Amino acid sequence: MQRLLTPVKRILQLTRAVQETSLTPARLLPVAHQRFSTASAVPLAKTDTWPKDVGILALEVYFPAQYVDQTDLEKYNNVEAGKYTVGLGQTRMGFCSVQEDINSLCLTVVQRLMERIQLPWDSVGRLEVGTETIIDKSKAVKTVLMELFQDSGNTDIEGIDTTNACYGGTASLFNAANWMESSSWDGRYAMVVCGDIAVYPSGNARPTGGAGAVAMLIGPKAPLALERGLRGTHMENVYDFYKPNLASEYPIVDGKLSIQCYLRALDRCYTSYRKKIQNQWKQAGSDRPFTLDDLQYMIFHTPFCKMVQKSLARLMFNDFLSASSDTQTSLYKGLEAFGGLKLEDTYTNKDLDKALLKASQDMFDKKTKASLYLSTHNGNMYTSSLYGCLASLLSHHSAQELAGSRIGAFSYGSGLAASFFSFRVSQDAAPGSPLDKLVSSTSDLPKRLASRKCVSPEEFTEIMNQREQFYHKVNFSPPGDTNSLFPGTWYLERVDEQHRRKYARRPV
């Protein structure tokens, strides 16, 4: 009967549900975790106006409880010191044992978010999962997550899995916002879940792995609002990174090509975004160019941290080429010699790279460096990487520092699909405001990362070998001690003879 209620009655129900303590989930996180933001009730969906400020109300990040130190890995792999820590910009890499898979990661992050904000399970009307970690060619991760909603009786939840390399989470976010701004919206929240396990065979690519998941609650009047009409997208057919071997977790990667594809997509998405925002400004009576100065912060999909620094420098080069000769000389000192170049001719120009990195260093430190905290200490989370960067940015700034700012975001998925978009941060940073609660909810990120167990390269390699051994195996229970997992973590308990997976949760 729930789905047959009028929108007004439905909203009144949700309002009461959030307010009544009797509807608080029975299994809550420890008291220390209950200080995080509780989203307000969703306003009524109207047919004559857009819901205002649709965006991120709350988010949760999950990463595995163990990591391998990249300095130790350099020694173990007999490579020069600094190859991973300096060349890639990585210090630690989180990873999953056989006990965790993409379903368990997503189960964990969704339940952690719902319990922390104490949201009734029937207040979610859309849930979509972005992932490229495929363990079943038919059954979606979303269907497994429906187990969490069973006790509430809420089966009326739209959305399913979205897959294209590291882009699925962003596609899911856009779909959630589009749903909320459409006639299909029933007044409830949307949830976006993105997660992946990034693993590679032994060799040069293995240190660029990682694992994790992010869940985001989407709704109107959000402290991080998606800016409407401001998405620059580029898509094309290319084989830079792909996974055609369904018997293996490992991808086929053309590293040099993938970097060029990433930068080319960045150029084109940024160009499209600039045109759209400049058109909006022109319609509002302001005819001026958009530059990086109009972004207070900038986050990127992060395959490895050095790639991000190079990408911000690339955006500066776009601004440089678009500027007048006088502006080039006055604002972009050290780049004058590159003024006659075309973007498409510069992807392998090392002299330009060095000049750009030097010229953009201060901008990188101010706009982007803080967003790389999780990536530096956990590695590449594929489709959740960009949103891990968002959480890192929030964890390293106060609500007052963020208030009123614009956060640029670049999402890239090999194959390829890419978008450049932006969030507008709420002006209200008062204690107890939605922005203050959202920022506070990320404040324990450094502490949580520090609480993980450091595993030797030898043990890490053995666990990677186990993942190969048990991949698509049937009739087994994963090896390992569940006490090594964080409290409240879901894990794979058993795979039966028909490939059916059973999960359990470590007590909170």
From Swiss-Prot:
The modification Phosphoserine is found at residues 433, 440, 456, 477. Pathway: Metabolic intermediate biosynthesis; (R)-mevalonate biosynthesis; (R)-mevalonate from acetyl-CoA: step 2/3. One of its GO terms (cellular component) is mitochondrion. It comes from Homo sapiens. The gene is HMGCS2. This is Hydroxymethylglutaryl-CoA synthase, mitochondrial. Coiled coil: none annotated. It comes from the Eukaryota. It is linked to 3-hydroxy-3-methylglutaryl-CoA synthase-2 deficiency: A metabolic disorder characterized by severe hypoketotic hypoglycemia, encephalopathy, and hepatomegaly. Changing residue 266 to S: In HMGCS2D; decreased protein abundance; abolished enzymatic activity. It holds the Pfam family HMG_CoA_synt_N. The modification N6-succinyllysine is found at residues 52, 83, 221, 256, 310, 333, 342, 350, 354, 358, 447, 473. InterPro entries: HMG_CoA_synt_AS, HMG_CoA_synt_C_dom, HMG_CoA_synth_N, HMG_CoA_synthase_euk, Thiolase-like. Homodimer. Disulfide bonds: none annotated.
